[in-house]
């Protein structure tokens, strides 16, 4: 089940925009807001749409997984990279969907709304295979692996936003414990060659700008993972502008393991 609109697509558990790029907290939010306006208008009429079920699944199977202590995984923000810029607006969308929901799905939407609102009781592991993206959750932390391949694109740049997002495609591994790790000015002052978990050259050369996702993918098709809904493992073969490496993550209960090997750059310093 999916909805397409130009270069955007809403698939059961995720929203993507400008190619297969995680983009829920900005473009996806507006996509849902526009769709909800029509669903609310047609409520209790003969024009009611089955599209409501798709939005419910989007939140129960996807959106609630990326929130921790009212913060969202920055991987889902596209070029507007942030962990909290649109959190309150997304909570409002969840409330509107909840009000439209029938009794058979009302409880699952209520739980999704609670998790978006700061309840961290959602635990498990989920592999979003269409986007080379894994989320792992326990009561006391949330983490994610954002891989890329020839099929997917990392955080883009455009209209002057996201001009330092190039390395956001290199295997970012965000970790939330307090929920305050990446809010405030974090993305304005951090070293753009040191996104959490990435493999990148540490030099002063100008960064390529991934305008509208151009150059934001990976040169190797190998990226993905496996999950039994509680534990998971994922990995990618990095190949970008001569930089190569094998990256993998293994997710357990009180710990997870990040491994890197075969790192090389024949053209590097």
What are the residue ranges of the model-derived segments?
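Broad hydrophobic/π-residue packing in well-ordered secondary structure
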Residues: 3, 15-16, 27, 41, ...
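Aromatic- and histidine-enriched alpha-helix N-cap/loop-to-helix transition segments
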Residues: 26-33
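Aromatic-rich surface patch/π-platform used for binding flat ligands and interfaces
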Residues: 8, 24-26
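Single conserved hydrophobic/aromatic residue that forms the stacking wall/gate
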Residues: 1-7, 11
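Acidic/His metal-coordination segments adjacent to aromatic residues that form catalytic metal sites
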Residues: 12-22
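Extended polysaccharide-engagement surfaces of secreted carbohydrate-active enzymes
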Residues: 31, 38-269
């Amino acid at each position: 089940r999916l909805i397409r609109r130009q270069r955007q697509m809403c698939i059961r558990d995720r929203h993507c925009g400008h190619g297969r790029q995680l983009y829920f907290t900005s473009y996806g939010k507006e996509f849902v807001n526009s769709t909800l306006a029509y669903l609310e208008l047609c409520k209790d009429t003969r024009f009611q749409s089955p599209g409501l079920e798709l939005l419910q699944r989007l939140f129960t199977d996807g959106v609630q997984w990326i929130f921790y202590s009212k913060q969202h995984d920055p991987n889902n923000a596209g070029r507007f990279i942030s962990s909290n810029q649109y959190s309150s607006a997304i909570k409002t969308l969840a409330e509107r969907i909840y009000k439209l929901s029938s009794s058979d799905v009302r409880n699952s939407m209520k739980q999704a709304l609670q998790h978006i609102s700061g309840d961290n009781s959602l635990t498990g592991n989920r592999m979003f295979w269409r986007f080379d993206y894994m989320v792992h959750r326990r009561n006391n932390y949330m983490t994610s692996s954002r891989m890329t391949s020839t099929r997917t694109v990392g955080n883009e740049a455009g209209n002057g936003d996201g001009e330092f997002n190039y390395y956001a495609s290199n295997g970012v591994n965000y970790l939330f414990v307090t929920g305050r790790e990446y809010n405030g000015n974090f993305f304005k002052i951090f070293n753009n060659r040191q996104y959490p978990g990435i493999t990148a050259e540490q030099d002063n050369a100008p960064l390529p700008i991934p305008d509208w996702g151009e150059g934001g993918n990976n040169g190797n098709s190998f990226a993905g993972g496996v999950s039994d809904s509680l534990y998971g493992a994922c990995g990618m073969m990095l190949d970008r502008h001569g930089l190569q490496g094998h990256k993998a993550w293994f997710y357990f209960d009180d710990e997870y393991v990040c491994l890197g090997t075969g790192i090389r750059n024949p053209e590097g310093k």
